[in-house]
């Protein structure tokens, strides 16, 4: 995958040199390039200006971003504008992006963008219902969530298929050694070696956690007959 990032602060992206994303770059599975669009600003390197019609704050000018975009070698990229008013990012969207070969992220700053910049864009995306000082942190979050889904980036594909949200439910509790730590012991079923009972326990706990913490997810989740019975039991036990 090739990712190009248009930003005023390329130095903010140093975390992408480490951990899973960094290893993906080392393996040649990922190429990330940074483009400081201030370098393409014609007007005394100014990237922002006052909005027509008045108003608070400054807007990013179209020219530096258009020229930076035009200079990128690309074929048919998905172009993502980080915008608080955009569609909210989620796991399904990360899975969609992971299928792409080329991504371009445009990171804003100041009050907003000249509206004409949006003609370059295929997707306007928000990290959530809050405002950051710029799009860099949002872009890094989306890149991290996306890159880990690329085949061969994580050793076992099943290791992310069981993640919270990938299945539509929150992930079940997990334990490792020692069996007993400060009086807190691992559930016996996980020590039993009985694969079917372990599967049922994990599914039950996943449903329980989702019902207790994110019941909104269940509104769009297609329950199996087995899951319906488990959820009914969970609700009964809560009463």
UniProtKB/Swiss-Prot annotation:
Subunit: Homodimer.
Protein name per Swiss-Prot or TrEMBL: tRNA (guanine-N(1)-)-methyltransferase
Organism: Streptococcus pneumoniae (strain JJA)
Chief place of localization: cytoplasm
GO cellular component, one term: cytosol
Enzyme class: transferase
Coiled coil segments of this chain: none
Binding site for S-adenosyl-L-methionine: 108, 127-132
Pfam family, one: tRNA_m1G_MT
Reaction equation(s) it catalyzes: guanosine(37) in tRNA + S-adenosyl-L-methionine = N(1)-methylguanosine(37) in tRNA + S-adenosyl-L-homocysteine + H(+)
Compartments reported by the entry: Cytoplasm
Gene that encodes the chain: trmD
InterPro entries: Alpha/beta_knot_MTases (IPR029028), tRNA_m1G_MeTrfase_C_sf (IPR023148), tRNA_m1G_MeTrfase_TrmD (IPR002649), tRNA_m1G_MTases_N (IPR029026), tRNA_MeTrfase_TRMD/TRM10 (IPR016009)
Function: Specifically methylates guanosine-37 in various tRNAs.
GO process annotations (BP): tRNA N1-guanine methylation
Keywords: Cytoplasm, Methyltransferase, S-adenosyl-L-methionine, Transferase, tRNA processing
């Amino acid at each position: 995958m090739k990712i190009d990032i248009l930003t005023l602060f390329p130095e903010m992206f140093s975390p992408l040199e480490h951990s899973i994303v960094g290893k993906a770059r080392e393996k040649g599975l990922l190429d990330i390039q940074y483009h400081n669009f201030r370098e393409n600003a014609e007007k005394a390197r100014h990237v922002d200006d006052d909005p027509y019609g008045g108003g608070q704050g400054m807007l990013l000018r179209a020219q530096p971003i258009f020229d930076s975009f035009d200079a990128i070698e690309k074929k048919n990229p998905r172009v993502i504008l980080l915008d608080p008013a955009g569609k909210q990012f989620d796991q399904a969207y990360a899975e969609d992006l992971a299928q792409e070969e080329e991504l371009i992220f445009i990171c804003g700053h100041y009050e907003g963008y000249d509206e004409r910049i949006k003609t370059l864009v295929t997707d306007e995306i928000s990290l959530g219902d809050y405002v950051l000082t710029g799009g860099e942190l949002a872009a890094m979050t989306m890149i991290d969530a996306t890159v880990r889904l690329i085949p061969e980036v994580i050793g076992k594909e099943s290791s992310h298929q069981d993640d919270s949200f990938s299945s539509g439910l929150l992930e079940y509790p997990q334990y490792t050694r020692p069996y007993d730590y400060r009086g807190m012991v691992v559930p016996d079923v996980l020590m039993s070696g009985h694969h079917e009972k372990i599967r049922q326990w994990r599914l039950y706990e996943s449903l329980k956690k989702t019902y207790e913490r994110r019941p909104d997810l269940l509104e769009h989740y297609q329950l199996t007959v087995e899951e319906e019975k488990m959820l009914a039991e969970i609700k009964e036990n809560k009463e």
